């Protein structure tokens, strides 16, 4: 379990040799992989590199450390921010935690919390709260790529009275620089990917634990599981959740069977996990849309109930894969002028979000989408996992991540490099259908306008459009939200009652009007975004 921490720094904080200097959640990779080595590695990095220590530490983590050398507390997380770190400054001192729910409960004992208008509209627009904002005032998040410092009195852990938290940028997304041939780029991707797999799976192997590896119909989790298997990590437990007999289910099942892995499937038919609002909010603090977490929470609970928890390792995912080796952009154009709301799932409240000061400043559209949708968004989709075990994706590996983002878009767009790497190095992995295209990745593509897809994919998309309108209305989609809301009347009725029962906890009239409008008139995605806020209101402001 990724143990969380909470720390209160005030005038009562004393210098005590027994007082912990390091508070930490997550893990770093070390050669021997024992707790003593891990602790020593982190402390040595912080003593030698200070605020830049995360650039020396591989893993998924967040923490706070008192440096007696610099007389300051250092707040830090891994460069890609896979573990969030939250803080608030109150009259009685600093409150800092990796656990949003715990932090809120501690602050509630001192003062009430209110909704942050910016955080509120970010969640309704994107499905997650972004950058340094959170859903509730006065809590902030340490932004990704930054360390924070709070000055202390000389040789004391007590903060200097009236001190502020200073943030220091230590990591930026790399700019496109290297120009390699497709073959050379694929060769380097393979070296870096295998090194990342070895680090992560060796951690489980050294602890004699069974790696949990997610599988779906996509390429990202497939390559994580496949290459780990090829490298000798064959004792895997593949887990999959999807509508029964959807392509995600069928493809994942076939791969797990062919590799002779253990297999755990959880059907999502009926959408019942949409009712797990309260359980998920306890893990997320309402800072990310709840429904994506509900599947993970339920399937991990099922697996724990069937196995000894002590034998289970990390959850290995393919998180961020197709936007690292591929790209968020589908063409080779990477504009420097773009909408602040580019990448949002709902554009209903663009004006309100901009009026409340939402002004992300990234130098191009790919960086904007990678930071907001990828690092601040998709990464938050694992918050429910951390309550049970740790999680890692080989695509988080900073060497692989930086290498790929430096490659020109002509190599990465439309999965050009991704499919080349698979077909050249792992041709057997290309024998399975890719859920996104409904055909194999070796199928010839046909360009119509700016889009290039296999003919079979064009035809399937046309038929789906005529028959269902949206993929989320198709019962054979992995998570068909709109289909569930339309057909599962009992679930929809319970969610409607939940929404209406707690709506008045949004005490600001305009915000209350807007969230009701989104829930009443929105599509499935917009409805669950609205419900995520309501669940947080129930838990934190009632």
Regions found by a protein language model. Name each.
Residues 1-271:
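Cysteine-centered catalytic environments shared across enzyme families
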Residues 39, 398-401, 512:
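Residue-level signal for cytosolic alpha-helical hairpin/rod architecture
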Residues 48-51, 60-61, 131-135, 294-307, ...:
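Short alpha-helical segments and helix-capping/turn motifs at coil-helix boundaries
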Residues 56-59, 133-141, 204-209, 386-387, ...:
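Short coil/turn segments at secondary-structure boundaries
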Residues 59-60, 374-378, 468:
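Short, motif-level signal for alpha-helix interfacial/capping segments enriched in acidic residues
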Residues 69-72, 89-91, 152-153, 172-432, ...:
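ATP-dependent adenylate-handling active sites, centered on carboxylate activation for C-N bond formation
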Residues 334, 428-520:
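PAPS-dependent sulfotransferase catalytic core
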Residues 526:
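Charged substrate- and nucleic-acid-binding regions of tRNA-handling and nucleotidyl-transfer enzymes
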């Amino acid at each position: 379990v990724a143990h969380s921490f909470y720390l209160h720094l005030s005038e009562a904080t004393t210098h005590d040799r027994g007082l912990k200097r390091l508070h930490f959640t997550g893990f770093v990779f070390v050669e021997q992989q024992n707790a003593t080595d891990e602790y020593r590695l982190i402390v040595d990095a912080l003593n030698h590199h200070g605020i830049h220590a995360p650039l020396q530490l591989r893993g998924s983590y967040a923490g706070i450390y008192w440096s007696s050398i610099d007389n300051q507390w250092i707040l830090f997380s891994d460069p890609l921010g896979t573990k969030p770190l939250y803080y608030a400054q109150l009259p009685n001192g600093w409150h800092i935690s990796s656990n949003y729910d715990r932090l809120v409960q501690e602050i509630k004992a001192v003062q009430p919390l209110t909704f942050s208008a910016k955080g509120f509209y970010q969640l309704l627009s994107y499905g997650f709260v972004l950058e340094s904002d959170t859903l509730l005032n006065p809590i902030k998040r340490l932004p990704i790529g930054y360390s924070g410092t709070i000055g202390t009195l000389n040789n004391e852990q007590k903060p200097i009275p009236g001190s502020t938290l200073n943030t220091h940028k230590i990591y930026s997304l790399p700019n496109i620089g290297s120009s390699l041939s497709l073959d050379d780029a694929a060769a380097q991707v393979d070296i870096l990917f295998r090194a990342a797999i070895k680090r992560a799976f060796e951690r489980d192997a050294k602890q004699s634990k069974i790696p949990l590896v997610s599988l779906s119909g996509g390429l990202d989790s497939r390559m994580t599981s496949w290459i780990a298997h090829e490298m000798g990590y064959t004792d895997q437990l593949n887990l999959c959740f999807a509508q029964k007999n959807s392509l995600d289910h069928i493809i994942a099942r076939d791969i797990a069977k062919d590799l002779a892995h253990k297999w755990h499937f959880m059907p999502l038919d009926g959408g019942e996990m949409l009712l797990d609002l309260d359980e998920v909010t306890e893990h997320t603090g309402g800072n990310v849309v709840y429904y994506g977490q509900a599947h993970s929470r339920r399937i991990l609970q099922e697996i724990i109930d069937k196995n000894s928890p002590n034998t289970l390792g990390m959850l290995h995912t393919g998180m961020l894969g197709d936007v690292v080796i591929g790209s968020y952009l589908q063409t080779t154009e990477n504009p420097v002028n773009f909408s602040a709301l580019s990448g949002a799932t709902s554009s209903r409240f663009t004006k309100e979000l901009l009026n409340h000061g939402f002004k992300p400043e990234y130098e191009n559209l790919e960086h904007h989408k990678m930071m907001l949708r990828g690092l601040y968004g998709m990464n938050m989709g694992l918050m429910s996992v951390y309550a049970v075990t740790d999680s890692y994706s080989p695509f988080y590996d900073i060497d692989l991540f930086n290498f790929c983002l430096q490659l020109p878009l002509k190599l990465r767009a439309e999965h050009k490099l991704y499919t080349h790497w698979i077909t050249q190095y792992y041709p057997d992995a290309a024998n399975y259908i890719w859920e996104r295209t409904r055909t194999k990745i070796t199928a010839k593509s046909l360009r119509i306008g700016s889009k290039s897809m296999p003919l079979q994919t064009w035809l399937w998309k046309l038929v789906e459009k005529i028959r269902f309108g949206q993929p989320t209305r198709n019962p054979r989609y992995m998570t068909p939200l709109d289909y569930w809301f339309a057909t599962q009347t009992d679930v929809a009725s319970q969610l409607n009652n939940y929404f209406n029962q707690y709506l008045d906890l949004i005490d600001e009239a305009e915000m209350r009007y807007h969230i009701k409008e989104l829930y009443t008139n929105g599509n499935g995605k917009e409805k669950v975004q609205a419900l995520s806020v309501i669940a947080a209101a129930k838990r934190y402001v009632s």
